[in-house]
Amino acid sequence: MTERVVLAYSGGLDTSVCIGWITEQTGAEVIAVAVDVGQGEDMEVIRKRALACGAVEAEVIDARAEFAADYCVPALRANALYMGRYPLISALSRPLIDKHLVAAAHRHKATAVAHGSTGKGNDQVRFEVGIGSLDPELRILAPVRDSGMTRDRAIAFAEAKGLPIEVTKKSPYSIDANLWGRAIETGFLEDIWNAPIEEIYAYTADPAVPRPADEVVVSFSDGVPVAIDGRPVSPLEAITELNRRAGAQGVGRIDLVEDRLVGIKSREVYEAPGAVALITAHQELENVTVERDLARFKRLVDQRWAELVYDGLWFSPLKRALDAFIDTAQRHVTGDIRLVLHGGRAVVTGRRSPQALYDYRLATYDTGDLFDQSLAKGFVELWGLPSRTAARRDLAAGAGE
């Protein structure tokens, strides 16, 4: 029986070339699997392209709702920002793609899964560790990395085989897009002194262009967005609408030199209007509803959660344990946040929650204040006791010298 290989297919140059390369080098049949995570492309065109490039079968899986509910929402509840800024656009989609690749391999009785990642990027790790976590027995092929395939060689291969790919050596950028955002790299951006130019952006309008502000109210239940301006929405609908509205205001542009998993620093430009607006709102609702010590510790958990996902460890035991912690921490994160979207910023202007720990009667300095200030003196004395005790010791030691 001819060996079968399932290929993670994007429709681009590298994965299109991978189809012919795998067939030539291994004699295997290639089944192309394209997962729709909201990249905004015509998936039927991509499916037909895979067949035209030599795949014996090609599948398109609409995973947009699944991506929103099971991957973007957990990232939102974790306020997931790698290095404090990057909302894990590409990193979030890879474990979902891994899941569908492994399922396809089982359906088609394939013995291997292939991807088109290079040896310099993070995605090779995310694909291979994720696939190995779901089925350790599947072999993994990485033709672009393992054959040292350059862009020039890939173009030459495509031209020699007559592959239906429109590409030129002048195409300057590498772009990865999904529902949660869009990543742009390479080209002139590799000189970190060069400022991004307006033409690279697609999800966000120029924030410097004057336009009326947009006010939006986002409602959450247990940390999950459930309504916008009072209208019930699914996670997919919430992200889609805020991508549109925040994007129209230029919200969510990020220019970052980040620490890649493989040990190099890389300049990346991102646009994630919906993600940035939602995380801004969610963080503020946590400020209102989460107790201080839990909030402090959760910030540490959030950071580690983002690092694990960035590093391709979505299916790891630690990630699962952190998920359980975050789930508990979100039990009271219910309420409404009002945002003003304008000039590239999402600014919180209002908060309300039936679970709020903010008590006006305790916080006010006006008439009606219920805070008993007579208790403060003893609290301050006890709070400062360790510091005063240490100071006396240090002063005595100094005097002894």
Swiss-Prot record:
Q: Which reaction does it catalyse?
A: L-citrulline + L-aspartate + ATP = 2-(N(omega)-L-arginino)succinate + AMP + diphosphate + H(+)
Q: Which Gene3D superfamilies does the UniProt record give?
A: Argininosuccinate synthetase, chain A, domain 2 (3.90.1260.10), HUPs (3.40.50.620), Single helix bin (1.20.5.470)
Listed Pfam families: Arginosuc_syn_C (PF20979), Arginosuc_synth (PF00764)
Question: Which BP terms does GO give this entry?
Answer: argininosuccinate metabolic process; L-arginine biosynthetic process; urea cycle
Pathway(s) annotated for this protein in UniProt: Amino-acid biosynthesis; L-arginine biosynthesis; L-arginine from L-ornithine and carbamoyl phosphate: step 2/3
GO CC aspect terms: cytoplasm
Keywords noted in UniProt: Amino-acid biosynthesis, Arginine biosynthesis, ATP-binding, Cytoplasm, Ligase, Nucleotide-binding
Binding, ATP: A8, Y9, S10, G11, G12, L13, D14, T15, S16, G116
GO molecular function (one): argininosuccinate synthase activity
EC id: 6.3.4.5
Q: What is its main location?
A: cytoplasm
What domain of life is recorded for the organism?
Answer: Bacteria
The reply on keyword S-adenosyl-L-methionine is no
> Which InterPro entries does the entry link to?
Arginosuc_syn_C, Arginosuc_syn_N, Arginosuc_synth, Arginosuc_synth_CS, Arginosuc_synth_type_1_subfam, AS_cat/multimer_dom_body, Rossmann-like_a/b/a_fold
Q: What enzyme class is recorded for this protein? A: ligase
Places the protein is found: Cytoplasm
In which residues is L-aspartate bound?
A: T118, N122, D123
Sites binding L-citrulline sit at Y86, N122, R126, S174, E258, Y270
Listed under subunit, the entry gives: Homotetramer.
List the HAMAP family hit by this protein, alphabetically.
Arg_succ_synth_type1 (MF_00005)
Question: What's the family?
Answer: Belongs to the argininosuccinate synthase family. Type 1 subfamily.
Q: What name is this protein filed under?
A: Argininosuccinate synthase
- What species was this sequence derived from? Acidothermus cellulolyticus (strain ATCC 43068 / DSM 8971 / 11B)
Name the gene. Answer: argG
